[in-house]
Amino acid sequence: MDTVTIGAKGISVSLDLAVGHIAGMEVEADGRVLKPLHRAPWVGSPRESLPENLPEGTVRLSGDFLCAPFSASDVEAAPLHGWSANSAWDVVENGAIAGGWRAVFRLRRKVMGATIDKVFTLRDGHPFLYQEHVFSGGSGAISVAHHPMTVMQGGGRLAFSPKRVAVTPATPLEPDPARGRFMLAYPARASDLTRFPLAAGGATDLTDYRAEDRREDFITLVEADHGGPGWTAIARRAEQDLVLVLKNPAELPITMLWFSNGGRDYAPWSGRHIGVLGIEDGRTAIGHAASLGDNWLKHEGVATAFALAEGRSVSFRHVIGAAPLAGGEPPSSVESAPDRLRVVTAGGAARELSFDGGFLRIGRSVPA
């Protein structure tokens, strides 16, 4: 596998250049090595052991990757989640910067005529990967999402920045009981994340990832207006750590959750993709055409694509991090300061992590 690994004090990240997926991320803290991101169990298996028609991005499914577009490429022909998640990236820059390391990768293919750069920055002593994607030129509009995945051996608890509403699509990912299973009601919506409708009746707590619930479920969370960074925190029980995913809601106004816990019985999933949660921050509906057309998010006042044009560029930023955590309870709030991230528990105890508070550009204008 053609991977590039970059590092700074206390952190390293590897990128699989064949598909632009993060192949590994390690954070050193309190004498431990934390691994916040997931890799599918079939990665590295002989290609002939996997279904012939599998997109390359599923063959090498790992870590986080750029979806451009998210889901179906039904405007410009490409595999699921676009060429950005299924084809080769080149190293454009890779070197030390003051107090850290920076690498720039470029997608060989163009998307809607645009050149795409992926920028990784690591800082000494910061337990975070700082990412930026830059689209230069092109025409039309593109929907986008990050696709970070974490995995829990014994389940975990989730917490979020304020959300306006949670909505499931019209149909589940796996409607055929011969192929898989799901738990949530489709379509459904709720403003209380701790009481979301179940297909079987009643309600479930979306903030409780239970290891025993075998299912594939997909739900979209719409950010509320709160003026701070958007964040998702996952307190992983068995791993005794906290995984943090942060965004600028003006750039990426929704967070899509993919609960993948042994809910697909067909290859290559085969009931072995267990304990996985995708935290997919995006500016998208489900599919490129849906994102450009009329969709329910637009009716909620939520943008679902970035406009592209020759002579201009658009970009968005994203952060993934990890820290040790005993007790398994996620934070009640996450607050950004210029040089640190303050993680506050329900009991009021605070922990501070070294953080570039200006990176996410909160409060600054974003192109349409």
Feature-to-residue mapping (PLM):
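Asparagine-centered strand-capping/turn motif at beta-strand->loop junctions
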Residues: V134-G138
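Surface-exposed acidic/polar loop and edge beta-strand patches at domain peripheries
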Residues: M1-Y130, A141-A368
